[in-house]
Amino acid sequence: MDFMKLAREKAKLVEMDDRLVNRAINEGFSGGEKKRNEIFQMAVLEPSLAILDETDSGLDIDALRLVAEGVNRQRSAERSIIVVTHYQRLLDYIVPDFVHVLAGGRIVASGGADLAEKLEAQGYAWLERGGIGKLDVEIRA
């Protein structure tokens, strides 16, 4: 399969206008289009490990769903996806296999999706080390 055909096929994954594949990376893209472009690039490159850092930042609810659907469609036994987020809302659409809480550059708590739900409900104060950390989510099929 030639590259342009592959790119157009993968653009459909995140409902990206296939004419955008002819633009330079992120040239003239809105914030939501840039995030969808990240997922599009992941689909084209098919990495065995992908790290998505705050991929939900600045997304409206429709764009969030599109990005999450794009991530979910790429879940496989051959790929690990690490999603870094501060908010539970992304995890309403991407159910994590593991959740790790980072604070001060260290993992201070680990668990399943219920850990993220507890953080959303109770905040970070209950953690032994306290402080605000990033919610680091690992997804494995």
Which residue ranges define each predicted feature?
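Conserved H-loop
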Residues: 78-93
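Short coil-to-helix N-cap segments within the nucleotide-binding domains
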Residues: 58-59
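Helical segment within the ABC ATPase nucleotide-binding domain
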Residues: 64-77
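ABC-family P-loop ATPase nucleotide-binding domains
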Residues: 1-46
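Conserved beta-strand-loop-alpha-helix hinge in the C-terminal portion
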Residues: 93, 102, 106-129
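Walker B motif beta-strand of ABC-family P-loop ATPases
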Residues: 49-51
